[in-house]
């Protein structure tokens, strides 16, 4: 996986330093890598996501919410109780 310079030079400092949300950066990075591996959206539960990056389920949920607010992550579900599908956004590439 190739990481955009922006992710390391700007986004990491912004999420970890300014926003004080290091888990959000880990979630973003892991989902970006997984999206590349799967060649598309990532469908995964909060519990599986949390276990994949080594954090609590509530920390993963909070991070996903923060990334959605920052428009760095699109989340969709086919039903309210369905497992979410994630699509990493790269707004700096527009």
Spans of features found by a protein language model:
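Short recognition helix of helix-turn-helix/winged-helix DNA-binding domains
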Residues: 1-52, 81-82
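Winged-helix/helix-turn-helix nucleic-acid-interaction surface
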Residues: 57, 61-94
């Amino acid at each position: 996986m190739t990481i955009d310079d922006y992710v390391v030079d700007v986004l990491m400092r912004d999420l970890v330093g300014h926003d004080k949300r290091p888990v959000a950066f880990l979630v973003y990075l892991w989902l970006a890598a997984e999206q590349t591996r799967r060649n598309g959206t990532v469908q995964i539960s909060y519990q599986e996501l949390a276990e994949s990056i080594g954090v609590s389920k509530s920390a993963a949920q909070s991070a996903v919410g923060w990334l959605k607010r920052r428009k760095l992550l699109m989340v969709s579900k086919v039903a309210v109780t369905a497992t979410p599908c994630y699509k990493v956004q790269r707004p700096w590439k527009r």
